[in-house]
Amino acid sequence: ADPNLAPAGVYSREFLVSTGLWFSLADRFIFAADVRAALNYVKSGNVDAAIVYVTDGLTEPELLIWDIVPKDSYSPISYPAAAIGDGNKHRGANTFMEFLESPEIADIFQSYGFR
């Protein structure tokens, strides 16, 4: 994904810079708007490979996940969530936040490749 458009592009660039491949392969890169577009490039045969989130790669069983990028080669990936405000008016939002932090939802996230 394009580092100017998508977080996945930023993480990909960090990995490629850390391995020394960013500059040596720069003229061969094709940037997609996002991870889904990158996966579609691979599915359509327009590119040979793409760097995508494992969670997205797992949604395309016909594609081969070739390798996992080492975690120490890019910034930590997080998906923040927040409930704005408090009180009775926002009880549903607070309940949802508690649900997201529950062990049950952690198991569901892990089953889809999130850690």
Give the positions of each predicted feature.
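Exported/periplasmic ABC-transporter solute-binding proteins
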Residues: 1-115
